[in-house]
Amino acid sequence: MGEYIMEKNTIILGIETSCDETAVAVVKNGTEIIANVVASQIESHKRFGGVVPEIASRHHVEEITVVLEEALKEANITFDDIDAIAVTEGPGLVGALLIGVNAAKAVAFAHDIPLVGVHHIAGHIYANRLVKEVQFPLLSLVVSGGHTELVYMKEHGSFEVIGETRDDAAGEAYDKVARTLSMPYPGGPHIDRLAHEGEPTIDLPRAWLEPDSYDFSFSGLKSAVINTVHNAKQRGIEIAPEDLAASFQESVIDVLVTKASRAADAYNVKQVLLAGGVAANKGLRARLEAEFAQKENVELIIPPLSLCTDNAAMIAAAGTIAYEQGKRATLALNANPGLDIEA
């Protein structure tokens, strides 16, 4: 008997085009990846030192049909097997989002398949459900190029932002510091690698803000790094880039881990989930593991590297919950670059 008598499997097709990855995935029951195809554009944006929205949109137009067909082929299914289509409706670059949203609407209309809109950050959080079943209440530390926030969830589909950045996101600070150190885009992995070769010997600020605040601020730290480099150049002093990278990374991680740990205690959560592109950072992963190893009642979940950066499996995972909760989008669904996760 066993697990095979379960009710019909829920098959969700996920589509993600919020920034510079064109991604389509097929996920079963919100937890099992059947296909996960990602076409990255990093090479196209590298020489500009960041994502160029116009170029990103053009690439999505070129790639979306190919990636969609590849995902269906990899999953060995047809459109008839799909219960719903989940697509990132925001936040992100409006031109990029539009490609995914319109592709999803076209397929939904042509094949009469239900449509679900997904918040990009909800996707990052639900990437963790592809690793392990989530337990509530939980806290998610979301760290990416555009977002740095602590999100409290008391149940599926309920998101309360208890802390967020007041200026730069952590990933943004990484990219800007990398540029100051003449490193290629995206800067995060380069700084992470370099930081492991150096020592955090340079005194850099940590923005703790008010004693009871779970908010973040990285603009002061970013400016301090840039000023340190400029001052050293003016004085003709040599600063070891690996030490600067290590000092910067330690400053960022100190604040992220301390605030996540404090919030986990205050909200009495069962799990802490790491989410977002910067979740791939080895230094951050190691520090979180060390911190939460000391807490007996809190389980830390860290997704594999392939599920940290933008992908569509996470959108399908979040979309499964929305679909099962009866949420549906109409064909009037539009890209919403400023979409609020708490809405």
From Swiss-Prot:
GO terms for biological process: tRNA threonylcarbamoyladenosine modification. CDD domains: ASKHA_NBD_TsaD_bac. The keyword Iron applies. InterPro entries: ATPase_NBD, Gcp-like_dom, KAE1/TsaD, Peptidase_M22_CS, TsaD. Binds 1 Fe(2+) ion per subunit. Its EC number is 2.3.1.234. Gene3D superfamilies: 3.30.420.40. GO terms for cellular component: cytoplasm. It is found in: Cytoplasm. One of its GO terms (molecular function) is N(6)-L-threonylcarbamoyladenine synthase activity. Substrate binds at V142, V143, S144, G145, G146, D175, G188, D192, N281. Its cofactor is Fe(2+). Belongs to the KAE1 / TsaD family. Required for the formation of a threonylcarbamoyl group on adenosine at position 37 (t(6)A37) in tRNAs that read codons beginning with adenine. Is involved in the transfer of the threonylcarbamoyl moiety of threonylcarbamoyl-AMP (TC-AMP) to the N6 group of A37, together with TsaE and TsaB. TsaD likely plays a direct catalytic role in this reaction. This is tRNA N6-adenosine threonylcarbamoyltransferase. The gene is tsaD.
